[in-house]
Amino acid sequence: MRVEQVNWVDIPAGLLRRGTPVDEIAAVARRYADIRVPVEWYLKEAPRAEIHVPAFRIARTPVTVGQWARFAAATGRPVPETPADHPVIGVPWEAATAYCRWLGERLGLDVRLPTEDEWERAARGDDGREFPWGEEYRTGLANLLDLGIGTTMPVGSFPDGASPFGVLDMAGNADEWTSTPYAPYPGAPAEVPTTEDWAFDRHITRGGAFRHDRDLARCARRHGAYEEDLEAIGVGFRLAAPAA
């Protein structure tokens, strides 16, 4: 495959069961109590809502080092010293959107980052599942902290962890930028913060990376780039485009 080509997955228009019901947040916090995440962090997922998401396309895997390298050469940006088939990480949001514009010009297509709702629909499908592969967490379906790898792996290494639409690596390996700035969901509990001033960047990331615990791999989990060293925390991105 040429670096300009993208393996697109068509996501049909449909209802997203977005987020987590308010009355289930305490149970979620108990389920992941060993990770010691404050319950307030999970409250950002509330309330549950049914959202219509128009049809779109999303890349089957995150952007790889090999795909990034040609853009980097053309724009004077660094290329990570990791294998070409690994996800590129350490990419600021502005650089990710610049890649989208560059590739879009080459393909004659409106390439962009997915919105937060698009990302969650591609991960959850129609049934509002907890993880891309189903309701229960299973070690070995994603490159997360419990696997003990400690770095990225080739994209698509966990086909059994695919989402209902066949999208890969929606959990683990690389955390992924969306185009959506953080804001509480409409109707959110009063204690949900209105901003995330502590975050290095206000845009939502999704999916978790190789260094993260399993709770960040939950389809509903909303978080951000909490450290300036985006390579250390494994932040990458995947592409979206209008429906064919």
What are these regions (language model features)?
Residues I11, R17, V22-A26, R30-E40, ...:
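Functional-site microenvironments in short loops/helix caps that host divalent-cation chemistry
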Residues M1-T75, W93-E94, R101, E105, ...:
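Short, compositionally biased
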